[in-house]
């Protein structure tokens, strides 16, 4: 088991040398910290790679306004494609997920589309949601959900897969699936109790309660609450605090925490040891020591 844990940790850093040339680049007019903007593409899910003072941040934006960003096949196909690009993009140090649609982050699954599916097709679609959110969760760089408006059902399950959740005072979150005689099927029954505890998770899922941002903050469902329209601003602020840090160290820290939470503490210590071993031979570690000695800010390159 120990050899297996160490091998998994070692393999996880090999992607650093892989590059991607398919990521969309943003323009200065396309991002004014969460303000709605126009774009030439008609994509329902848009990936941007920010530049200038926000370099290192990539943003996934949902733009399916006519159905309140409901999760349909086309949107999810685009979402998965963007996640695949980000997974092999060493220049991206933080990912922010947000909505471009006023008043809604994500209203959950597209139930009208779901009604046209056979039982097999419906099961396949739920499986694709579950696997997509796991892909989001296992991105090696930190992820931040900037929540404005409604984020229920699959919308809540999506933000649960992020490392940080920032909710504006316009936000509404919850898992109302039992009211439709189903259960959360894209990770909600597993991630929610791990985040807020079993009793509270059962209460929210059994009752289908919808929470405002204040209550979500109180129970630890989100880490930050902002004024309406400012969730993306806060997400950018958090991202800019992370970006100057050693990118390999950030990835290894995330890996050690995430993997360690799913095993006993002794095994978690082995994961931490193996993760720490990955940062020792890096150029960034030497740069950090040199910068400290020279009393200057370090410049980390992810090497």
Curated annotation (Swiss-Prot):
Compartments in which it is found: Mitochondrion
Listed GO biological process terms: fatty acid beta-oxidation; L-leucine catabolic process
Enzyme's top EC category: lyase
SUPFAM superfamilies for this protein: ClpP/crotonase
Pathway membership, UniProt: Amino-acid degradation; L-leucine degradation; (S)-3-hydroxy-3-methylglutaryl-CoA from 3-isovaleryl-CoA: step 3/3
Keyword RNA-binding: no
EC number: 4.2.1.18
Coiled coil: none
Gene3D superfamilies for this protein: 2-enoyl-CoA Hydratase, Chain A, domain 1, Lyase 2-enoyl-coa Hydratase, Chain A, domain 2
UniProt-recorded Gene Ontology molecular function terms: enoyl-CoA hydratase activity; methylglutaconyl-CoA hydratase activity; mRNA 3'-UTR binding
Pfam family, one: ECH_1
Key words, A-Z: Branched-chain amino acid catabolism, Lyase, Mitochondrion, Transit peptide
Keyword Transferase: no
Known catalytic reactions: (3S)-3-hydroxy-3-methylglutaryl-CoA = 3-methyl-(2E)-glutaconyl-CoA + H2O
Cellular component GO terms, alphabetical: mitochondrion
Domain of life from the UniProt record: Eukaryota
Record note on quaternary structure: Homohexamer.
PANTHER family the record matches: ENOYL-COA HYDRATASE-RELATED, SD19268P
Task performed by this protein: Catalyzes the conversion of 3-methylglutaconyl-CoA to 3-hydroxy-3-methylglutaryl-CoA.
Family: Belongs to the enoyl-CoA hydratase/isomerase family.
Protein name: Methylglutaconyl-CoA hydratase, mitochondrial
Organism: Dictyostelium discoideum
């Amino acid at each position: 088991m120990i050899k297996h844990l160490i091998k998994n940790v070692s393999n996880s850093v090999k992607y650093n040398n892989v590059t991607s040339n398919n990521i969309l680049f943003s323009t200065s007019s396309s991002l004014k910290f969460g303000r709605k903007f126009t774009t030439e593409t008609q994509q329902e899910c848009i990936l941007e790679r920010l530049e200038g003072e926000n370099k290192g941040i990539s943003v996934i934006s949902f733009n399916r306004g006519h159905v309140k960003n409901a999760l349909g096949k086309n949107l999810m196909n685009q979402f998965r494609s963007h996640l695949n690009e980000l997974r092999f993009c060493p220049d991206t140090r933080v990912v922010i997920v947000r909505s471009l649609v006023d008043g809604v982050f994500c209203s959950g699954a597209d139930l009208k589309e779901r009604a046209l599916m056979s039982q097999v097709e419906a099961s396949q679609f739920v499986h694709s949601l579950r696997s997509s959110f796991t892909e989001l969760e296992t991105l090696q760089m930190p992820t931040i959900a900037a929540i404005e408006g409604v984020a229920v059902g699959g919308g809540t399950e999506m933000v649960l897969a992020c490392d940080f959740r920032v909710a504006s005072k316009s936000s509404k979150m919850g898992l109302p699936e039992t009211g439709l005689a189903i259960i959360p099927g894209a990770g909600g029954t597993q991630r929610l109790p791990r985040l807020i505890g079993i009793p509270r998770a059962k209460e929210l899922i059994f009752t289908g309660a919808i929470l405002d941002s204040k209550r979500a903050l109180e129970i630890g469902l989100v880490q930050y609450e902002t004024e309406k329209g400012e969730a993306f601003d806060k997400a950018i602020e958090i991202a800019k605090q992370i970006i100057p840090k050693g990118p390999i160290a950030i990835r290894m820290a995330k890996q050690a925490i995430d993997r360690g939470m799913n095993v006993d503490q002794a095994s978690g210590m082995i994961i931490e040891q193996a993760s720490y071993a990955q940062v020792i031979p890096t150029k960034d570690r030497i740069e950090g020591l040199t910068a400290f000695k020279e009393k200057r800010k370090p410049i980390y390159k992810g090497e």
